[in-house]
Amino acid sequence: EIAQCLVGSEMCIRDSLLQYTIKKNRGKMKSAIKKIFVLTGCVLLLVTSMRAQRACLNLSETLWNITLDRSAVWQNDSLYVPPVNIHDLPVHIPTGGWNLLDTPDKIGVTLPATVEQHLWGWNGETFGVTGNYVGVSWFDTKINVPADWRNKRIVMNVASVRFRAEIFVNKKLVGYDLVNSTPFAVDVTPFILPGQENVIAFRITDPNGNFNWKDSQVYTWGEYRTNPSHGFGGITGKVELVATDKLYIGDVFIKNQPDPHSIEVEVTACNETKNPMKAQKMLLTVKEHKGEKVLYRKEYSVENLVVGENKQTFHIHLPVAKLWSTDSPHLYDLSVSVGTDNYTQRFGFRWFEVKDIHGDKQFFLNGKRIVLRTAISWSFWPDNGITPSDELARRQVESAKKLGLNMLNFHRTIGHSNVLDYADELGLLYFEEPGGNQYPINHFNDNNKQSKFYFAYRNEKLVRMIKRDRNHPSLVIYNLHNERGAWPQVQDYAQMRMAHSLDPTRILTYNSSNGENPENEANARFKLHLMPNDTTFYDYGWYDRHHAGGPGCYHDNLYWGKDNYHRFSDHKDEIIYWGEDGAIGTPPRLQLIRDEILQSGTTSGWEAMDYMKWYDAYDSFLKHNGFAKAFPTVDDLTRAMGNVAFYYQGRVIENIRISNTVDAYAVNGWESMKLENHSGIVDNYRYPKGDVEVMARYNQPLFLAVKMNRKVLNVGDTTIVDTCLLYTSDAAD
């Protein structure tokens, strides 16, 4: 709108200023005219600059309505995986007609949003998961589209939905997608009416889903097996409209290199005109993300852009660039301009790899050894259940940093962009799984409708996940399955090749598993992996083993002596990763959660009222049973119980650091929610369950470990005390 105003008013500005100057001071005409043309030049420069930016309308902040379509028939629908031809699909309008949306069940909603967030207990039931809604719902809004978007290419970018979305613009079907929790785009150019109000409606179908940690359960939708995922239905990500010309940047992939000061930039330019375009200029600029310092600026000549996609590769080496690390997370912006379009991608200079140091496989970040200390997150969240607000995403990363962890895992479920954004900004590594990537081994080769749908679906989900997340410097490892009991099949090798071709810069593993992982022999089920910039399949060199359960608290028998203790390993020629360890159940920070719910003013979310009742029960117990002296508040009690798990996890992390052979340790687990996963060391609101200092002291970069082989003694007993100086080389210099 500003650009349009300036373009339309340029002559008016010039004429008005001239007349004003003539009347005010004819004697200074020459100086005034110079100033006028300087101003006019600034206006033109501003207009040119603004034209070089793609235009966006954020639909997430507009107000949406939610309407439950209780009578809709969906149970035996035919399902379609991308790509789809929208003209070949059945059109499902609201049951009884579009006037159904005139009486919504909820109004004034912003995105992301789920039915479970705003209409939990729609059926009068709220206990456990009885308030969940399964079926069809409608999310609709209205948006005014600028008149100057005429003759533009207009795309709707959807960050994610669950499960299926049928998208309507002005009551016409324009889009269809069911690869849930992944981004997709819909070309709405023929359907949007620039200069007018447009009605946007999403028909969401939530057919099934889980409210627990498992991603191996079988869920069906009619005659199809569907990828297991959390059972929330809605628009689970942000939505925007973007307008560009017919020549635009479709994607930018910044490939980190073994020399961490170097990057390879892969630009996808899209030509949607009817003819090839000759001699185009492409400008690449690298600048500090926080600041204005430009490190690199170069214009390249692109001789021929054919109709469709055009990939261009550029190599940039910047010795002056500051490296991204967990202690110094320096970030940069790379901007690419072609034609009238400009695309900016944030990234960091860094390199993560495995090195063999005198026969010992170890992780290295930017040439320094790093021992990964992580926790597994099932990605349940307050309110909408499935997607974090920016505040919660930041709190997740900050809580991990306060506890001294240097990584977290998206475990059995795909990750979230805003969590990775804060991990990039604050310095936390990430390990990601697509979730639900399992299928019964005896049906792999059925080659029927069900198996074809499932494999096409799981591959598309993985493709979208990788393309969405591969520019985040925080993300270092992909894993395809969790506790997969089956050996990799032909389809699994093909999927791994495909994934590695999309992002050859990261470690990719087939499985993170429990069971008897053989230590000194090759084994594809447990150990199959691909290394950065290496297309060789390795079935030895990666030793990942789960010990999910915990002992309840720390025991004397967890340390007997310097070579005999819990999670000791001297197995050096493979990466040693204890992939799940030590589940100890503790309650959430009920008092902090209650205060946050009361401050928000709403208890409509899928678990808010349960936490309120939970707090009241604890508070009543303390006050009426004589425990208030020991625990004056509910938070005093829950925090003390949380410290039991913190102490255990801290001492075991101390053990693996003493070994100096173990390369990674994953706490089981990260967050708890109302139903289970009580072993989480933070609650669903991402509050640490205990005093962070209890666990953080064992994650310090430099500290003296004091280990006793007996801490519980009778009078006259003796104990042996070992001391070990621990230093973490990934600490800041």
Model-identified regions with their sequence ranges:
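Aromatic-rich peripheral "rim/lid" segments of glycoside hydrolase catalytic domains that contact
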Residues: N668-D722
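Substrate-binding/catalytic cleft of secreted carbohydrate-active enzymes
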Residues: M407-E671, E676-N684
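Beta-strand-rich binding/interaction modules
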Residues: I263-S301, I720-S729, D733
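Accessory beta-strand-rich segments of carbohydrate-active enzymes
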Residues: D69-R70, V129-Y248, E272, L429-F431
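Short glycine/proline/serine/threonine-rich loop/turn segments at secondary-structure transition edges
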Residues: N151-K152, I192-Q196, F211, M277, ...
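Conserved small/polar residues in nucleotide/adenosyl-binding loops
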Residues: E1-I2, L6-S16, Y727-D733
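Active-site-adjacent substrate/metal-binding segments within catalytic domains
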Residues: Q117-N144, N151-N157, R162-F168, K246-F253, ...
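Extended carbohydrate-recognition surfaces in non-catalytic/accessory domains of CAZymes
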Residues: Q53-N157, D215-P228, F232-I235, D245, ...
